[in-house]
Amino acid sequence: MKQTLLSLSNLTKQFDGKKVLDSLDLDIFDGEFITLLGPSGCGKTTLLRMMAGFEHPDDGTIALGDQDLTHTPPEHRPLNTVFQNYALFPHMSVFDNVAYGLKMEKRPKQEIRERVEDALAMVQLEDFARRKPHQLSGGQQQRVAIARAVVKRPKVLLLDEPLSALDYKLRRTMQVELKRLQRELGITFVFVTHDQEEALSMSDRVVVLKDGLIQQLGTPREVYERPANLFTARFVGETNFFPGRVDKANGDDTITVDVFGLKRTFRKPDFPVSGGQSLHVLLRPEDIRVLAPDDEDGVAGKIVERNYKGSTLDSVIHLEDGTEVLASEFFDEDDPTFDYRLGEPVKVSWVDGWEWLLPTEPEALPEEEGTDA
């Protein structure tokens, strides 16, 4: 049984009359890596700042175990924050940056030295203690910021998009390092990002936010493979949306659905369905199978774009009714026919059971612009 460490209850916040958080409830477990994921303006940064104490809710409470933190100043909360710009003191050495918080608490010199050395060892920077921040790479600066945060032994570490300034390769490396560090420390990590790949690869659970409301809370696999609504399906990864119409409900917890004129048998979804009902059939690009044009199975179309990415071949296919299909297939270097020409006719199919069904309720696309909140 997982134990709740940080409890957020009915949190509400408005800026200039607009609700940024709307009666939000969230329990964060002891020792988990949880990510707040969403587009700009969804409320994820405001929520993190509330946990840290830099913002106060208009309504609701924040509790750490039995301790009410709602109005506790940031410096008195057993939570530390790693900011996007790291906020290192440029005139101080790595050692002094990490030791700063302990010195402010007037800890004994011996204790400070031991704890700083331990923290630097955790982030593999013990040989860099005398360097200044400008002598470090971006990844090393980030690790110093993490060491400075964990040296005070917080119960929760809050990370506000700490990887966004790093290049792609270093960002991938630091994703692995952060997860390793979190496991070794056993500290609860609350991570904020708009990057779906980061959220899926690092988290124990993901909170998908939109307009100050939780759209879905679950494991990365649940969020990706079984999105709760159209917003989550669109925002987390790429998705093909096929129009389906229920032909009939079968007697074995399955339904027959007409998709592009094909009768496919699907598992009955969690929402009520009846004959003639329209619904969305969701398939990720990696679920799509591209077949030869004379194959008996599948829907006819043609290749309009292809991108070789080393391990995968990504294709865009236009079906005869104009529907655009994204397909991502693992590249088979032993198959000389595994490639496509632009304009080449193909058929599109998938394995029954790989699809996910959602009702055809109207849902706005995620906004790409706006000030993050």
Curated annotation (Swiss-Prot):
GO cellular component: a single term: ATP-binding cassette (ABC) transporter complex
GO terms of molecular function: ABC-type putrescine transporter activity; ATP binding; ATP hydrolysis activity
Pfam family for this entry, one: TOBE_2
Major localization listed first in the record, in broad terms: membrane
Keyword annotations from UniProtKB, A to Z: ATP-binding, Cell inner membrane, Cell membrane, Membrane, Nucleotide-binding, Translocase, Transport
Protein's membrane topology: Peripheral membrane protein
EC number(s) on file: 7.6.2.11
Protein's cellular compartments: Cell inner membrane
Domain ABC transporter: 6-236
Signal sequence, start to end: none
Annotated residues for binding of ATP: G38, P39, S40, G41, C42, G43, K44, T45
Class in the EC hierarchy, top level: translocase
Domain of life of the organism encoding this protein: Bacteria
Catalyzed reactions per annotation: ATP + H2O + polyamine-[polyamine-binding protein]Side 1 = ADP + phosphate + polyamineSide 2 + [polyamine-binding protein]Side 1
Cross-referenced NCBIfam families: potA (TIGR01187), PRK09452.1 (NF006987)
Family affiliation: Belongs to the ABC transporter superfamily. Spermidine/putrescine importer (TC 3.A.1.11.1) family.
Quaternary organization: The complex is composed of two ATP-binding proteins (PotA), two transmembrane proteins (PotB and PotC) and a solute-binding protein (PotD).
Function: Part of the ABC transporter complex PotABCD involved in spermidine/putrescine import. Responsible for energy coupling to the transport system.
PANTHER family xref list: SPERMIDINE/PUTRESCINE IMPORT ATP-BINDING PROTEIN POTA, SPERMIDINE_PUTRESCINE IMPORT ATP-BINDING PROTEIN POTA
Protein's name in the database: Spermidine/putrescine import ATP-binding protein PotA
Organism whose genome encodes this protein: Marinobacter nauticus (strain ATCC 700491 / DSM 11845 / VT8)
